[in-house]
Curated annotation (Swiss-Prot):
Its cofactor is [4Fe-4S] cluster. The gene is leuC. It catalyses: (2R,3S)-3-isopropylmalate = (2S)-2-isopropylmalate. NCBIfam families: leuC, PRK05478.1, PRK12466.1. This is 3-isopropylmalate dehydratase large subunit. HAMAP family: LeuC_type1. Its EC number is 4.2.1.33.
Length: 468
C-alpha cells in the first residue's frame, strides 16, 4: 500500500462513492449550523417534507448577529434582518430536533469555539458548516471546511456532501518561536509568504516543531486562517496535546469507546514518503510579530517594517497596493509603529479563547489603555467568559479600561451592533481586513491578542516585545 497523507486517510475513510469524473460523495460526521446560512436550508427541507437525516450529529448556535451587550435577549437590540435570522434558527433547531445552544445558554458562543469546547469536534472526523472558518476544526486532525447554503440543505437531508478531492500541501514551520511571537503570527506569516491564492485547490497540513509546540488553542488559530490562504481546509495531525484536550469533554467518547477511538486517532498522521503536491517551509525563529497594513490578509509585514510603496509590487498588484494604501489612509514609508488606532477588538473564532484572553491580561495587567481609545474584549463563548471571570482575567481587563462583552462574533464582521465608524482604525484579532469588513469604510489591522493589547496601551500599532 502506498504511503498516504493525513488528508488522504480521512478522505478515504469517509468516501461513499466516486464517479468516473472524480466527483465524490463523502459522509459527514458533524454538521455545525448558525443563523446566517441555515434559514433557507431548513426551509428547503420543510417544503420538501424532509427531516434532518442525523439530528444527533447536527449542532446549531446563533453567533454572527447576536449583540454582545447586556440585555441582548431583547429583540430591539437587533436589526430586523438579524432578528429574523436568530428567531428562524431558534424555530428550526427546535422543530427539527438538532442540538441547540440558544442565546441565553451559557454554552452559546461562536460556533467554531463551541464545537471543540463541547467535544463535538474529534480527530479523523469530517466537519462542515455554512461558514468559511470551519477550517478551525482541522486543528484536531479533522477534515473541516465551509459549505454553501444549498450544500447545508444537502447535508441536513442526507448527511453526505458532493465534492472533488483537493491536492495535498504541506506547510512546515521549523524550529522554535521567539518570545512575543504567537500562533497568529505564524498563520499571518504563512499567508504573507504564499499569498491569498497560495493554497487554492489544496488542503494544507501544518507541521514542524513550532506547530507541535502549540497548544490546541494555538493550533485552532493557525487552521482558522487556512481559508485566507486560499486553501479548502487546514489540518494538524493529532497527538497527545490533542487527546488531552478532548478527553472528558461533554460529547467526547467515554470508557471503552474512548480507548477504541484513541487507537484509531493514533494512526492519523502522514506516512513517511507520502506525496505532497506543494511544500512551503518557514523558519519559526525568523517569524516576528506581524501586522497587516492593507486590505488583504496577504498584506503582512513585521511590526518593525514600514508601509510599502505601490512601486514595490509588480503587475496587477501595483494598483491593488495603491488602492489599499489610499483606503487605509497610510503613506508609503510610514513606520508601522507610527500608525495610530481608534479601536481595539479582541475576540472572534480566530482569537476568542481563554488562552487568548490570558495573553491580553498578561500584557495589560496593572496598566491603563490609551485615553480616548475604544477597546473591547469579546469572549468566544459563555464558558470562556465564565472561566475568564473565575481566573480574574475579566477584572484585569476591566480595570485596564476594556469593555467586557458577552459571547458572539461581534466586530469581526459588520452584521451586528459592534461596528467601526467610517475612517475608524482598528487593531483586531480577527481574520479578515478587506474593505468594510468591520463596518462601512472601517480600517482593519490584523494582529495577535498580545499585539492588540500592546496597541490598546499605546494607542498605536506597537511591538509587544517592548512591553514584555
Amino acid at each position: 500500500m502506498s504511503p498516504k497523507t493525513l488528508y488522504d486517510k480521512i478522505w478515504d475513510a469517509h468516501l461513499a462513492h466516486e464517479a468516473e469524473d472524480g466527483t465524490c460523495l463523502l459522509y459527514i460526521d458533524r454538521h455545525l449550523v448558525h443563523e446566517v446560512t441555515s434559514p433557507q436550508a431548513f426551509e428547503g427541507l420543510r417544503m420538501a417534507g424532509r427531516k434532518v437525516r442525523a439530528p444527533e450529529k447536527t449542532i446549531a448556535v446563533p453567533d454572527h448577529n447576536v449583540p454582545t451587550t447586556e440585555g441582548r435577549e431583547d429583540p430591539a437590540q437587533m436589526t430586523e434582518e438579524s432578528r429574523i435570522q436568530v428567531q428562524a434558527l431558534d424555530k428550526n433547531a427546535r422543530e427539527f430536533g438538532v442540538h441547540y445552544y440558544p442565546v441565553d445558554d451559557i454554552r452559546q458562543g461562536i460556533v467554531h469555539i463551541v464545537g471543540p469546547e463541547q467535544g463535538w469536534t474529534l480527530p479523523g472526523m469530517t466537519v462542515v458548516c455554512g461558514d468559511s472558518h470551519t477550517a478551525t476544526h482541522g486543528a484536531f486532525g479533522a477534515l473541516a471546511h465551509g459549505i454553501g447554503t444549498s450544500e447545508v440543505e444537502h447535508v441536513l437531508a442526507t448527511q453526505t456532501l458532493i465534492q472533488k478531492k483537493s491536492k495535498n500541501m504541506k506547510v512546515e514551520i521549523t524550529g522554535k518561536l521567539n518570545p512575543g511571537v504567537t500562533a497568529k503570527d505564524i498563520t499571518l506569516a504563512v499567508i504573507g509568504a504564499t499569498g491569498t491564492a497560495g493554497g487554492t485547490g489544496y488542503v494544507i497540513e501544518y507541521c514542524g516543531e513550532a506547530i507541535r509546540d502549540l497548544s490546541m488553542e494555538g493550533r485552532m488559530t493557525v487552521c482558522n486562517m487556512a481559508i485566507e490562504g486560499g486553501a479548502r481546509a487546514g489540518l494538524i495531525a493529532p497527538d497527545q496535546t490533542t487527546f488531552d484536550y478532548v478527553k472528558g469533554r461533554p460529547h467526547a467518547p467515554k470508557g471503552a469507546q474512548w480507548e477504541a477511538a484513541l487507537a484509531w486517532w493514533k494512526t492519523l498522521y502522514s506516512d513517511d514518503g507520502a506525496h505532497f503536491d506543494k511544500i512551503v517551509t518557514l523558519k519559526g525563529e525568523e517569524i516576528e510579530p506581524v501586522v497587516t497594513w492593507g486590505t488583504s490578509p496577504e498584506d503582512v509585514l513585521p511590526i518593525t517594517g514600514v508601509v510599502p510603496s505601490p512601486e514595490d509590487f509588480t503587475g496587477g498588484k501595483v494598483e491593488a497596493a495603491r488602492r489599499s494604501i489610499e483606503y487605509m489612509g497610510l503613506t508609503p514609508g510610514q513606520k508601522l509603529t507610527d500608525i495610530e488606532i481608534d479601536t481595539v477588538f479582541i475576540g472572534s473564532c480566530t482569537n476568542g479563547r481563554i488562552e487568548d484572553l490570558r495573553a491580553v491580561a498578561e500584557v495589560v495587567k496593572g496598566k491603563k489603555i490609551k485615553s480616548g481609545l475604544r477597546a473591547m474584549v469579546v469572549p468566544g463563548s459563555g464558558l470562556v467568559r465564565a472561566q475568564a471571570e473565575e481566573e480574574g482575567i475579566a477584572d484585569i481587563l476591566k480595570d485596564a479600561g476594556f469593555e467586557w462583552r458577552l459571547a458572539g462574533c461581534s466586530m469581526c464582521l459588520a452584521m451586528n451592533p459592534d461596528q467601526l465608524a467610517p475612517g475608524e482604525r482598528c487593531a483586531a484579532t480577527s481574520n479578515r481586513n478587506f474593505e468594510g469588513r468591520q463596518g462601512y469604510k472601517g480600517r482593519t489591522h490584523l494582529v495577535s491578542p498580545a499585539m492588540a493589547a500592546a496597541a490598546a496601551l499605546t494607542g498605536k500599532l506597537t511591538d509587544v516585545r517592548e512591553l514584555i
